[in-house]
């Protein structure tokens, strides 16, 4: 058995699930998601929990077992609680603001960078240097957060740019001349 795949998924109250040939649908207070899965696997509800089962121990089924269980668990968590990824801006004059639903970043370019959120994702700016990306689809929220970070990745020498909150950036030392002549002669 897959260590991940055999774990049951708790279904919170207010969340309804429906499984039809290869499609898992879940509806909750935050919205509705559809997760396609391999029709060889079965998803059944048992005492308020979901169980993902595989028909055999073939390599293909073992590989899909844990993946499907995780995708279903993410969908259930998304429609009940949602997902939030926090980003922060580091750098002199770097700031963010909301322009309607769009995110406007001033991050060292000659023009502000405007990012429109796709359907199902919202931006929040609690402080000028903090950005919250939220939504019900974990994959989409993560991809949008990565796209925002990609606009200005943290540089290797000063760490200026857009980073995930708590992300450690390994800074390079810089030129030996900048350290007071302690390099090779």
UniProtKB/Swiss-Prot annotation:
One of its GO terms (biological process) is cytoplasmic translation. GO terms for molecular function: rRNA binding; structural constituent of ribosome. One of its GO terms (cellular component) is cytosolic large ribosomal subunit. Gene3D superfamilies: Ribosomal protein L6, alpha-beta domain (3.90.930.12). Keywords: Ribonucleoprotein, Ribosomal protein, RNA-binding, rRNA-binding. InterPro entries: Ribosomal_uL6-like, Ribosomal_uL6-like_a/b-dom_sf, Ribosomal_uL6_a/b-dom, Ribosomal_uL6_bac-type. HAMAP family: Ribosomal_uL6_B. Part of the 50S ribosomal subunit. Belongs to the universal ribosomal protein uL6 family. This protein binds to the 23S rRNA, and is important in its secondary structure. It is located near the subunit interface in the base of the L7/L12 stalk, and near the tRNA binding site of the peptidyltransferase center. This is Large ribosomal subunit protein uL6. It comes from Deinococcus deserti (strain DSM 17065 / CIP 109153 / LMG 22923 / VCD115).
């Amino acid at each position: 058995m897959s260590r991940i795949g055999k774990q049951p998924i708790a279904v919170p109250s207010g969340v309804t699930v429906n499984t039809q040939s290869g499609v898992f649908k879940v509806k909750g207070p935050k919205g509705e998601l559809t997760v396609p899965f391999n029709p060889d696997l079965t998803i059944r509800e048992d005492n308020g929990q979901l169980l993902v089962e595989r028909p055999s121990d073939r390599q293909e089924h073992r590989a899909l077992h844990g993946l499907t269980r995780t995708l279903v668990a993410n969908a259930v968590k998304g429609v009940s609680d949602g997902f939030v990824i926090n980003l922060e801006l580091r750098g002199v004059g770097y700031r963010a603001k909301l322009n309607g639903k769009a995110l406007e970043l001033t991050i060292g370019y000659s023009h502000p960078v405007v990012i429109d959120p796709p359907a199902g994702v919202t931006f929040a700016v609690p402080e000028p240097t903090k950005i919250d990306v939220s939504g019900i689809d974990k994959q989409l929220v993560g991809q949008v957060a990565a796209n925002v970070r990609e606009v200005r990745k943290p540089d290797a020498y000063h760490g200026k740019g857009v980073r995930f909150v708590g992300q450690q950036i390994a800074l390079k030392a810089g030129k030996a001349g900048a350290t007071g002549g302690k390099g090779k002669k």
